[in-house]
Amino acid sequence: MSKIPSVNIKELLDAGVHFGHKTSRWNPKMGSYIYGERDDVHIIDLRQSAVLMSVALNAIYETVKKDGKILFVSTKIQASDIIAEYAEKCGQYYVNHRWLGGMLTNWKTIAGSIEKLNKLEKTLGNEEALMGYTKKEILDMSRKKDKLLLSLAGIRNLNSKPDLLVVIDTNKEHIAINEAVKLNVPIVAVVDTNSNPDNVDYPIPGNDDSIRSIRLYCSLFADAALQGLAESMKASGVDMGAIQEHTDKALTSKSVSKLKQTKKFSKMKNIDEETNTEFEQALNDADKNKNSENA
């Protein structure tokens, strides 16, 4: 059984995962993941979010367990630093500024840019070599290095296509998703109410704008990857005492077939009554708190 992070509805609710976009901005393909609307804002069905997050976390865990590589992608401002932080935490790869066209499909060009970055760093770190350059030339090299680092820092050690792509905001990262589809790289993605989930293998219905939500997603992703790494190292005979334990609860992953994902929640048999009750209670508690604050 995989020891990946547990997901509970209250945690998702507290992070604002249930808040979608204004009802006028929705994508009809997300209809089966929407619980309802309040104040002209769609409310995401966290019962499905919890189950599908479990499925996605298991995919991350299994990928790393089998020594696969994961590429985290989100170039939006509020996610940029968070993506880098958690990707580095679990020893994986990331793109958190601009996605350069061809990062996956034209790797030869990207590899050339990485080689250029390495040469610039080597030159700038050699005081003797810098003696032959003017101050302006050194400044130009430094600027080129910084520009390349913004785009390539998180993938400079990636020497082949990733085994799994993890995306926050499918609309903004549509180029990355299209490239992954062309190369048959499976995709985990947070899909908001204005998203198109069609090309996503492991969709997670949720708010893709809130910093609290994004941090929660990335924390869960990183912990699942670390658990996969621990299993991989254990299988290789590595001393497990060197690996920090990040979770103390085992999660039983609940599977949802792609056919059932297109149906309304009420028809999905994989979500139990306990999850139903938890979601309804969490929403009621949130309403009570809101009403008491406005009283």
From Swiss-Prot:
One Gene Ontology BP term is: translation
Q: What Pfam family is a match, any one?
A: Ribosomal_S2
SUPFAM superfamilies for the chain = Ribosomal protein S2
Coiled-coil region(s) at which residues?
A: none
The residue ranges crossing the membrane are none
Q: Which domain of life is it from?
A: Bacteria
Q: Which family does it belong to?
A: Belongs to the universal ribosomal protein uS2 family.
Q: What is this protein called?
A: Small ribosomal subunit protein uS2
Its source organism is Rickettsia canadensis (strain McKiel)
GO CC term (a single one): cytosolic small ribosomal subunit
UniProt entry keywords in alphabetical sequence: Ribonucleoprotein, Ribosomal protein
Molecular function via GO: structural constituent of ribosome
